[in-house]
Amino acid sequence: MQSFPPEIWHHIFDHLISFDKFEAKNFGGLLRICRSSYVGGLHAIYYFPKLNPRNYHKFVDTISRKPTRKLVHHISLNNVSYASKASITSRLLRRCATNLETFSGPQSGLGFTALRAFSQCQKLKKIDLSILSEKIDLQYLFGGIQHLKHLEYIILPYLSIPAPMCTECWPSSLTFVGFSGGLTDDFLAESVFPPSLKSINITQCPLLTDAGIFSLLSKIGPNLSSVCVQYPMPELSRSGLDCIFQLCPNATTISIPANYITSTAFESIPESGHNVRSLEITYSGSLLTNISLIKADDLVGALVDGKLPNLHRLQWSIRLGWREESQDVQDLLELIDDQDGEVFITVK
């Protein structure tokens, strides 16, 4: 059987990668077709390897060879579970440092040496530590990332421990930060964020109070285009996020829990209106609670007053108890339709 030359196989694998560059791939079977497919497709196998507990240690051993390690651009250890140790993760990062662009951490095995190893990955654009179940001192994390000039995206671990000396160590090119863990009001108040920051997600921050949220949004809110706050935030009051429209006037995408907003959030929108285009209102709670939840009529009032002129996508939780046949919901649906918008009801 006549085989394609390696150059053709190279283009075939490039095409397969292009479907989703940020998804781990396993094209191992294609490498076995012939020698040309192996030579032409090796870069695709290592570009974003599909790692699991069975192949992880073999992969780390394989990339000890210099020609191979340069092929790795993306690493996800989400499926490695507890197979990774800090020393192995550190070795992995050092070996793949040349071209590594994204890194998703494991549930465990990200100690001091691994955090420091980030400093060698000068092309890193994204770090996701959202599933890490170990306590991480941000002093060591920031020590590894503060000089990464291309880092745009980072999600902090749920068990992060802030350090006062890190408040001025945020990388200069960040566009997205996922805040979580033991962040305090004082830490956020003293932090110096880069002007490039455009999108944030706040969740699982048990120490943050209304004052911390207000301080953070007062500082970075005008620059944000996307704001997402997720339940639980146990120290936030019922009105803890009422300031979000005022402090984030340019955010076009907003997702907030009804647990922390009241009708004041919409009443306080300036008469000049807000730029939000996509608004999601989630709710984690029971309808049997004594909490007075926002009503559809609160949004109706804001729309009638022209305060939400650009709202084209509205999504709310079915748990809010807004009955579709009620007059206020019907009015809300009609007003959104008049703006050529769409409405979604979710279970969140």
Curated annotation (Swiss-Prot):
Swiss-Prot/TrEMBL keywords: Mitochondrion
GO molecular function: ubiquitin-like ligase-substrate adaptor activity
Keyword Mitochondrion applies: yes
Localisation: Mitochondrion
Transmembrane spans: none
Transport among keywords: no
Biological process per Gene Ontology, one example term: proteasome-mediated ubiquitin-dependent protein catabolic process
A cellular component term, taken from the record's GO annotations: mitochondrion
Family membership: To yeast YDR306C.
Subunit description: Interacts with skp1.
Protein name listed in UniProt: Protein pof5
